[in-house]
Amino acid sequence: MSGRRITRREAMKTAGALVGAGVLTGIGSTVPSLIPKASAQPAKPSGKALRVGFQVHRTGIGAIYGAWYERTANAAVKLMNETGGIAGRPVELVAEDDGTDPKRGVEVVEKLAQQAKVDFIFGTLFSNVVIAAAPRAGELKIPYLVVSEGYHVASGKLNRYIFQPGITDVRAQVSALAPWIVRNLGKRITMVYPDYAFGYDHRDFFGAAAKRLGGNIAALVPIPLTETSFTKYFPRIPRNTDVVYHVMVGPGVLTFVREMGEHFGARRQKLFGFIDSLEGVDIGSSGLEFLEGSYIWEAFPRYADGYPTRYEAFYRSRVGVNASGASQQDGKNVSAYSHMFGVWETLFVIKEAVEQSGYESPGPKDYRAFIETLERAEWFNEGNWHPQGSKRFVGRLHQAFGRQFVSQVQNKKLKVVFRTKIEDGMYPPEADYTKQPL
C-alpha cells in the first residue's frame, strides 16, 4: 500500500468535499489538480465504513470541552458523509468517554482498538490523559491523533503513532505571544497556572521566552486542578507585578476570575489571560466586569467579526455556533471555540492522509503508509477543512504550527487586536519521530 496515490476516479468521488477545502501538501502528487467544478455532486459513500475512535471527555473536569468537541466531531463527520466520505467510504464515529481521567484514558484506547476495532483514535484534550494513554496506543500500534495543545507531542517524549496536526502547542503559542506581552503590558510578570503538565508547559516556555526578551518572572503560582476557592493564592502575587498571566481550566474558572476581581478591585495589575479560563463562559456574565480592558489569547476568535473569512463562516454554521460564539439553539450554551476547531481540522487531516496514502484497513502495512504520508506533509492550506488558518506541519515533530490571536475585553465582548505570524511560534525541533521504528 505504501507509495499508492489516490486515483482520479477516487478523487472525483470525493471532490465535493475538496472544493473550498484545505489540502495536505508537500507529499508529491496531490489531489488539487483533480478538483472538478464546484457544481459537481459527490457520489454517495459506499462500502465498509471507516471507523474513527473518538476518545471524548464527556464527564469529569473536561466535560465542557468534551461536549463541544463531540458536537464538532459529529458535524465534521456529517459533512464528510454528505460529500463522498473518506476515499469513497462512509465514516463512522465511535465515541467513548474517558471521564477526563488518565487511567480510564488508557482503558478507552484499549477498548477502541481491541474491541471496537477502529481504524484510528483521535480527540483527546487534557494533557494528563494524553500522556497516560499515548504509550498504550504506541504499544497497540494504532495512530492516535490528539487535540491537546501540550508540548508532549513535539517534545519527542511519546511515540511515532502520536500526532497533533490540528492545533498548535503551548510552546508555539507562548513563543509567538511573549514579544507582544512584554512590549505592550510590562516586563515584571506573575504566572498563575494549573498544577499539571499543561500548566508546566506555560510556566517553562513562557517564562523562558519572557526572560530572553528582558522580562522577569516575579512569582509562580500553581493551583491544583481540583481547587474550588482561590482567594488564598492571590496574596502570593507581588504588588509590583506589571502583568498577571493567568491560564486556568476546569469548572472552577468562573470562581477564579470573580475572586481575582474581588481581591484586586480597581487597583489590579494588567491582565493577560488564556481563553482556557473562559471557554464555555459568557464574557458578559455577572462578576466578570473585572476583565474589562484585559487581554486574552484566542486560537480562533469566539466572535464572528474577529476573523471574518468565508471558511470561518462555513465552519461556524456547520457546528451550529452563532456570531457571539454560543449555540444557535441556546444562547446560554457558550462554545469552546478556541479549541474545538482542532477536532474538525484533525478529522480532515485523517481524511487527507487516508486518501493520499491509500490506507484501507488496520495493519502494519497500511498504518505505515498513513504515518509516513502524514510525516511528509508540509502545509495544511486554509479552507473549509482548515478554517482557523493555514498550518505549517513539521513531520519530524508530528506537530502543526499556526497563527495566534490577542483579543481585548471591550464592552463585555472580545475584540481582536493582534494576530501573530506562523513563523513567530516556530522553534528549533528537539525530536525526530521519523527515526523511530514502526
Q: Where are these predicted regions, by residue range?
A:
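Extracytosolic ligand-binding ectodomains
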Residues: S2-L18, I27-L438
